[in-house]
Amino acid sequence: MPHQQILMLFGLLPVATNISTWWNFGSMLLACSTLQVLTGFFLAVHYTANINLAFSSIIHITRDVPYGWLMQNLHAIGASMFFICIYIHIARGLYYGSYLNKETWLSGTMLLIMLMATAFFGYVLPWGQMSFWAATVITNLLTAIPYLGNTMTTWLWGGFAINDPTLTRFFALHFILPFGIISLSSLHVILLHEEGSSNPLGTNPDIDKIPFHPYHTYKDLLMLTIMTILLLLIVSFSPDIFNDPDNFSKANPLVTPQHIKPEWYFLFAYGILRSIPNKLGGALALTMSIIILMTVPFTHTSKMRSMMFRPFMQMTFWMFAATFLVITWTATKPVEQPFTLIGQMASMLYFLFFISNPIMGWLENKIMKT
């Protein structure tokens, strides 16, 4: 439809009548992004990117800065909310075939990579024990790259070990990357409205559309209100629910935590990394766990867009969702049996979903012909 961007500005964008609550997570991600930028700015004003002062500056923000505890907790728990929303957003895209809008899907995958990088850099900034060791383990994976690995690692660290230059670089990257995320998000929305949103049926909705405002704005506001209430409840009553106990101790390069692990939203990728007992193989599997999302639009073989009428694919999809949760769970456990074996099997099933996707589509087409 021509002039969709102009119509969107006035809330008159025609949208399918049957899009469900699963389509609300895009606007919720926008709200999360706004919250993160605002709280992040106020935290950056008081934060000191120095290995001797970073941990103390976080304590100073929490104890001495007016409403600093609120800003710090909103920023930390807001990141978790961001990832909950983005994982549901991706799952909806996979289930309802939104990935067939290729440009939007590929820009979204790039957004996910950028978001994960930003969150990783942010996790290092408090310079707690788990921050330091998670940074050491993850950045050390660069050394697995043939020929260039050691040079790249030294360049990223700013020396031969994680030290003050590393923290300064990570703070600079954590500050600048959100602006890239905002730019890419704008491109993502523009590309989406070139073709328009999909819908649960996966059909062309041109014959049955309504203006975005007021119908879908109120629907979005309801979910935003629920998310805000949930966020404030966690901030008020359980602000440390997603934090690692080790991160309440200042970073000590001489003491290794019993079990090094990143934030919960990276555990699925970390679990896949851990399931391969080889450094280069693990690093490749970690990268592929995200990059493989880019292959989905090109391996779709079914004549139907949505999984709504595809029982075989529905079963495969929910197995994939369960696999994601199992990998996350095993990554929280020590590297010992039976967790290692469960993690390896779940990691295999994770990649098997993307391989079985085109096969299932082809099989369903065959069944429909008979």
Swiss-Prot record:
One GO MF annotation is: metal ion binding
Respond yes or no to whether keyword Plastid is given for this record.
Answer: no
Q: Which residues form a coiled coil?
A: none
Q: What are the UniProt keywords, alphabetically?
A: Electron transport, Heme, Iron, Membrane, Metal-binding, Mitochondrion, Mitochondrion inner membrane, Respiratory chain, Transmembrane, Transmembrane helix, Transport, Ubiquinone
Topological type in the membrane? Multi-pass membrane protein
Sequence positions that bind heme b b566: H89, H188
In terms of CDD domains, this protein maps to:
cytochrome_b_C, Cytochrome_b_N
Kindly give the InterPro entries that the UniProt entry links to this protein.
Cyt_b/b6_C (IPR005798), Cyt_b/b6_C_sf (IPR036150), Cyt_b/b6_N (IPR005797), Cytb/b6-like_sf (IPR027387), Cytochrome_b (IPR030689), Cytochrome_b_C_euk/bac (IPR048260), Cytochrome_b_N_euk/bac (IPR048259), Di-haem_cyt_TM (IPR016174)
Q: Which residues cross the membrane?
A: 25-45, 69-90, 105-125, 170-190, 218-238, 280-300, 312-332, 339-358
**PROSITE patterns on file:** CYTB_CTER, CYTB_NTER
> Where in the cell does this protein reside?
Mitochondrion inner membrane
**Source organism's superkingdom?**
Eukaryota
Instruction: List the GO biological process terms.
Output: mitochondrial electron transport, ubiquinol to cytochrome c
GO CC term (a single one): mitochondrial inner membrane
- Role noted for this protein: Component of the ubiquinol-cytochrome c reductase complex (complex III or cytochrome b-c1 complex) that is part of the mitochondrial respiratory chain. The b-c1 complex mediates electron transfer from ubiquinol to cytochrome c. Contributes to the generation of a proton gradient across the mitochondrial membrane that is then used for ATP synthesis.
Which Pfam families does the protein's record reference? Cytochrom_B_C, Cytochrome_B
Where does this protein hold a ubiquinone? Answer: H193
The UniProt record lists the keyword Acyltransferase = no
Q: What is the protein name for this chain? A: Cytochrome b
What protein family does this chain belong to?
A: Belongs to the cytochrome b family.
The record describes how the cofactor is bound as: Binds 2 heme b groups non-covalently.
Query: What cofactor is this protein dependent on?
Result: heme b
Q: Where, by residue number, does heme b b562 bind?
A: H75, H174
What's the source species for this entry? Eunectes murinus (Green anaconda)
Subunit structure and binding partners: The cytochrome bc1 complex contains 3 respiratory subunits (MT-CYB, CYC1 and UQCRFS1), 2 core proteins (UQCRC1 and UQCRC2) and probably 6 low-molecular weight proteins.
Miscellaneous section: Heme 1 (or BL or b562) is low-potential and absorbs at about 562 nm, and heme 2 (or BH or b566) is high-potential and absorbs at about 566 nm.
Which gene codes for it?
MT-CYB
